[in-house]
Amino acid sequence: MRAMVMDAAGRPLVARDIPMPEPEAGEVRLRIEACGICRTDLHVLDGDLAGPKLPLVLGHEIVGRIEATGAGVTAMSAGQRVGVPWLGSTCGRCRHCLRGAENLCDAPVFTGYTRDGGFAEYCVADARFVFPLPDGGDPVALAPLLCAGLIGYRALKLAGPAERIGLWGFGAAAHILCQ
Protein backbone atom coordinates (compact mmCIF):
# COMPACT_ATOMS: atom_id res chain seq x y z
CA MET A 1 0.00 0.00 0.00
CA ARG A 2 1.07 3.61 -0.46
CA ALA A 3 1.83 5.82 2.52
CA MET A 4 3.53 9.10 3.37
CA VAL A 5 6.34 8.10 5.71
CA MET A 6 8.37 10.15 8.19
CA ASP A 7 11.93 8.80 8.48
CA ALA A 8 13.34 11.55 10.71
CA ALA A 9 12.25 14.81 12.31
CA GLY A 10 12.78 17.89 10.20
CA ARG A 11 12.76 15.99 6.91
CA PRO A 12 9.99 15.86 4.30
CA LEU A 13 7.58 12.95 4.25
CA VAL A 14 8.36 10.35 1.60
CA ALA A 15 5.76 8.53 -0.54
CA ARG A 16 6.53 4.85 -0.17
CA ASP A 17 5.07 1.38 -0.62
CA ILE A 18 4.83 -0.31 2.77
CA PRO A 19 3.28 -3.63 3.84
CA MET A 20 -0.47 -3.80 4.31
CA PRO A 21 -1.17 -3.78 8.07
CA GLU A 22 -2.98 -6.80 9.46
CA PRO A 23 -5.34 -6.38 12.42
CA GLU A 24 -4.35 -8.23 15.56
CA ALA A 25 -6.80 -9.36 18.24
CA GLY A 26 -9.08 -6.47 19.20
CA GLU A 27 -8.13 -4.37 16.18
CA VAL A 28 -9.76 -3.32 12.92
CA ARG A 29 -8.18 -2.49 9.57
CA LEU A 30 -9.78 0.28 7.59
CA ARG A 31 -9.46 1.65 4.10
CA ILE A 32 -8.93 5.36 4.62
CA GLU A 33 -11.34 7.80 2.98
CA ALA A 34 -9.83 10.97 4.46
CA CYS A 35 -7.29 12.05 7.05
CA GLY A 36 -7.00 15.61 8.31
CA ILE A 37 -3.73 17.41 8.95
CA CYS A 38 -3.47 18.72 12.50
CA ARG A 39 -0.93 21.10 13.99
CA THR A 40 0.16 18.17 16.18
CA ASP A 41 1.21 16.31 13.01
CA LEU A 42 3.44 19.27 12.14
CA HIS A 43 4.89 19.34 15.68
CA VAL A 44 5.83 15.65 15.31
CA LEU A 45 7.29 16.22 11.85
CA ASP A 46 9.27 19.26 13.01
CA GLY A 47 10.68 17.35 16.00
CA ASP A 48 8.86 19.44 18.62
CA LEU A 49 7.45 16.24 20.17
CA ALA A 50 10.20 13.80 21.06
CA GLY A 51 10.06 10.04 20.74
CA PRO A 52 7.82 9.13 17.80
CA LYS A 53 8.21 5.63 16.42
CA LEU A 54 10.31 5.72 13.28
CA PRO A 55 9.65 5.22 10.51
CA LEU A 56 6.18 6.65 11.10
CA VAL A 57 2.98 7.20 9.17
CA LEU A 58 1.51 10.42 10.63
CA GLY A 59 -2.18 11.36 10.81
CA HIS A 60 -4.79 11.03 13.57
CA GLU A 61 -7.96 12.54 12.10
CA ILE A 62 -8.89 9.39 10.19
CA VAL A 63 -12.16 8.51 8.50
CA GLY A 64 -12.48 5.15 6.79
CA ARG A 65 -14.39 1.92 6.35
CA ILE A 66 -13.59 -1.30 8.13
CA GLU A 67 -12.21 -3.95 5.79
CA ALA A 68 -11.05 -6.56 8.28
CA THR A 69 -11.39 -7.30 11.99
CA GLY A 70 -9.06 -9.09 14.35
CA ALA A 71 -10.08 -11.85 16.73
CA GLY A 72 -12.56 -10.80 19.38
CA VAL A 73 -14.00 -7.80 17.52
CA THR A 74 -17.76 -8.30 17.51
CA ALA A 75 -19.26 -4.80 17.82
CA MET A 76 -18.03 -3.67 14.38
CA SER A 77 -18.09 -5.22 10.95
CA ALA A 78 -16.75 -4.88 7.42
CA GLY A 79 -18.12 -1.89 5.54
CA GLN A 80 -18.86 0.17 8.66
CA ARG A 81 -17.60 3.76 8.55
CA VAL A 82 -15.52 4.73 11.58
CA GLY A 83 -13.21 7.46 12.81
CA VAL A 84 -9.82 7.06 14.47
CA PRO A 85 -8.58 9.80 16.84
CA TRP A 86 -5.21 10.74 18.40
CA LEU A 87 -5.75 8.56 21.49
CA GLY A 88 -5.24 5.13 19.95
CA SER A 89 -5.47 3.05 23.13
CA THR A 90 -4.77 3.09 26.84
CA CYS A 91 -3.62 0.60 29.45
CA GLY A 92 -6.99 0.46 31.24
CA ARG A 93 -5.20 -0.29 34.54
CA CYS A 94 -3.50 2.89 35.76
CA ARG A 95 -5.13 5.25 38.27
CA HIS A 96 -6.19 7.62 35.47
CA CYS A 97 -7.84 4.93 33.37
CA LEU A 98 -9.59 3.47 36.41
CA ARG A 99 -11.25 6.82 37.20
CA GLY A 100 -12.33 7.44 33.59
CA ALA A 101 -9.56 9.89 32.64
CA GLU A 102 -8.03 7.80 29.86
CA ASN A 103 -6.60 10.93 28.25
CA LEU A 104 -4.10 11.01 31.14
CA CYS A 105 -3.13 7.30 30.90
CA ASP A 106 0.35 6.36 32.11
CA ALA A 107 0.94 4.16 29.04
CA PRO A 108 -1.03 5.57 26.09
CA VAL A 109 -0.69 4.69 22.42
CA PHE A 110 -1.12 7.64 20.08
CA THR A 111 -2.28 7.34 16.48
CA GLY A 112 0.25 8.86 14.10
CA TYR A 113 2.90 9.14 16.84
CA THR A 114 3.56 5.85 18.62
CA ARG A 115 1.58 3.78 16.10
CA ASP A 116 1.10 4.38 12.39
CA GLY A 117 -1.68 6.74 11.42
CA GLY A 118 -3.76 7.78 8.46
CA PHE A 119 -1.46 9.32 5.84
CA ALA A 120 -1.83 6.03 3.97
CA GLU A 121 -4.33 3.90 2.09
CA TYR A 122 -5.01 1.66 5.12
CA CYS A 123 -4.40 1.62 8.85
CA VAL A 124 -5.14 -0.56 11.85
CA ALA A 125 -6.69 0.71 15.08
CA ASP A 126 -7.80 -0.61 18.44
CA ALA A 127 -11.51 -1.32 18.02
CA ARG A 128 -12.24 0.09 21.50
CA PHE A 129 -10.98 3.51 20.41
CA VAL A 130 -12.74 4.01 17.07
CA PHE A 131 -16.03 5.86 16.66
CA PRO A 132 -18.93 4.89 14.38
CA LEU A 133 -19.58 7.66 11.84
CA PRO A 134 -22.58 8.36 9.59
CA ASP A 135 -22.46 6.77 6.15
CA GLY A 136 -23.69 9.90 4.38
CA GLY A 137 -21.28 12.42 5.87
CA ASP A 138 -18.48 14.00 3.87
CA PRO A 139 -15.27 12.29 5.07
CA VAL A 140 -13.26 15.50 4.61
CA ALA A 141 -15.71 17.38 6.86
CA LEU A 142 -15.81 14.56 9.43
CA ALA A 143 -12.02 14.17 9.81
CA PRO A 144 -11.33 17.31 11.93
CA LEU A 145 -14.06 16.28 14.36
CA LEU A 146 -11.78 13.42 15.46
CA CYS A 147 -9.32 15.85 17.04
CA ALA A 148 -10.47 19.44 17.48
CA GLY A 149 -14.10 18.32 17.53
CA LEU A 150 -13.47 15.87 20.37
CA ILE A 151 -11.50 18.47 22.32
CA GLY A 152 -14.30 21.03 21.95
CA TYR A 153 -16.98 18.50 22.84
CA ARG A 154 -15.12 17.42 25.98
CA ALA A 155 -14.65 21.04 27.07
CA LEU A 156 -18.35 21.77 26.60
CA LYS A 157 -19.35 18.61 28.47
CA LEU A 158 -17.04 19.48 31.38
CA ALA A 159 -18.58 22.96 31.54
CA GLY A 160 -21.90 21.35 32.44
CA PRO A 161 -25.05 23.48 32.37
CA ALA A 162 -23.14 26.78 32.34
CA GLU A 163 -24.88 29.57 30.44
CA ARG A 164 -21.54 31.08 29.43
CA ILE A 165 -18.14 29.61 28.83
CA GLY A 166 -14.78 31.24 28.19
CA LEU A 167 -12.60 30.21 25.28
CA TRP A 168 -8.87 30.66 25.72
CA GLY A 169 -7.52 31.27 22.25
CA PHE A 170 -9.63 30.53 19.25
CA GLY A 171 -8.16 27.60 17.40
CA ALA A 172 -9.87 24.71 15.68
CA ALA A 173 -11.48 23.32 18.85
CA ALA A 174 -13.12 26.64 19.72
CA HIS A 175 -14.18 27.20 16.12
CA ILE A 176 -15.90 23.80 15.96
CA LEU A 177 -17.42 24.26 19.42
CA CYS A 178 -19.03 27.56 18.41
CA GLN A 179 -20.67 25.90 15.44
Each model region followed by its residue ranges:
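Mid-domain Rossmann-like dinucleotide-binding core that forms the NAD(H)/NADP(H) cofactor-binding site
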Residues: 82, 135-179
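Cysteine-cluster motifs in flexible loop/terminal segments that predominantly coordinate metals
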Residues: 75-76, 87-131
